[in-house]
């Protein structure tokens, strides 16, 4: 029996459901999900293994016009998704008319590899809207196979997965067959804490935050974690901590609960807040945090 393996890279505008889709494919919560734009900052790999296949799903940041160095690095992750894809998933949502970056859109419509256009959130539409959107995207991206789906409700996701398996090239596996992702444990600690900050703070605060896990010690029954929450300004530090530390405590409790579910162990989590001035515009800091791949 021939073995198939390949990279299935998911791209699209912010908040169209890319992370929800990858989590649905993988069956694990690898990508954090919030209603805020730019929740996904990195390119995250989720691996699905079968007896004769290995699918490497790649979740990418939503496509935006970069305003500072961090966002430019995020768009570099999207560019790399075009370079190594065996199948490209272009994800849109009901009511969406176009990708926000014309250069990326041109890459999609001139792609030499298979393109699956997934029209997401159809649970929020009626039949007439769905038919109009299907026709619109057939005209805009004639090289794509179009699937109406609801990633959140898991509608038609299996049909897309079955088609992906058919499109995979013949190849040995790229990773061990028990692998779930290419990211280390510390990455998921960082992302879990950052998700709670996105959910609990407004305006610019969540976007000025980066997390660094300083310590990750795993024993038989407990994992001890010490994490630093980086911000750019002293005023942001005060907001993160909150009155008598209440806001930071809330983030810590929520993150610990999710991490205990993820790792299946008791978690002892310590969080501290530190000012790292203008880190989003520093090439050195971005490289240190794993963004700048150049």
Annotate the PLM regions:
Residues 1-82:
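Conserved G1/Walker A P-loop phosphate-binding module
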Residues 31-33, 100, 172-176, 199-211:
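Active-site phosphate-binding and catalytic loops of NTP-dependent enzymes
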Residues 59, 120, 150:
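Active-site glycine-centered loops adjacent to acidic/histidine catalytic or metal-binding residues
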Residues 40, 63-65, 97-98, 125-126, ...:
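Catalytic P-loop NTPase motifs of RecA-like helicase/translocase cores
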Residues 185-294:
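P-loop NTP-binding site
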Residues 17, 156, 247:
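Conserved glycine(s) of the Walker
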Residues 52, 76-144, 217-219:
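Conserved C-terminal guanine-recognition region of P-loop GTPase G domains, centered on the G4
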Residues 114, 123-181:
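Canonical P-loop GTPase G-domain recognition
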């Amino acid at each position: 029996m021939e073995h198939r393996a390949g990279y299935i890279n998911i791209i699209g505008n912010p908040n169209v459901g890319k992370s929800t889709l990858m989590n649905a494919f993988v069956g694990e919560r690898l990508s954090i999900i919030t209603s805020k734009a730019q929740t996904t900052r990195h390119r995250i790999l989720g691996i699905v293994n079968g007896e004769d296949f290995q699918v490497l799903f790649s979740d990418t940041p939503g496509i935006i016009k970069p305003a500072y160095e961090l966002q430019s690095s995020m768009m570099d992750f999207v560019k790399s998704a075009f370079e190594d894809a065996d199948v490209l998933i272009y994800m849109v949502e009901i009511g969406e008319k176009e990708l926000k970056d014309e250069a990326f859109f041109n890459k999609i419509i001139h792609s030499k590899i298979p393109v699956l256009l997934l029209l997401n959130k159809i649970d929020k539409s009626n039949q007439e809207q769905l038919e109009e959107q299907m026709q619109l995207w057939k005209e805009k991206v004639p090289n794509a196979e179009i699937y109406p789906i609801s990633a959140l409700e898991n509608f038609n996701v299996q049909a897309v997965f079955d088609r992906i398996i058919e499109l995979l090239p013949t190849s040995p596996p790229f990773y061990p067959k028990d692998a779930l992702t290419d990211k280390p444990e510390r990455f998921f600690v960082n992302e879990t804490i950052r998700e709670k900050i996105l959910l609990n703070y407004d305006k610019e605060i969540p976007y000025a935050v980066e997390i660094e896990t300083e310590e990750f010690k795993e024993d038989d029954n407990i994992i001890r974690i010490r994490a630093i929450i980086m911000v750019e300004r002293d005023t942001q530090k005060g907001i993160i901590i909150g009155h008598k530390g209440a806001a930071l405590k809330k983030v810590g409790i929520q993150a610990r609960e999710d991490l205990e579910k993820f790792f299946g162990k008791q978690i002892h989590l310590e969080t501290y807040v530190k000012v790292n001035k203008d880190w989003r515009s520093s090439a050195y800091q971005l490289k240190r945090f794993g963004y700048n791949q150049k």
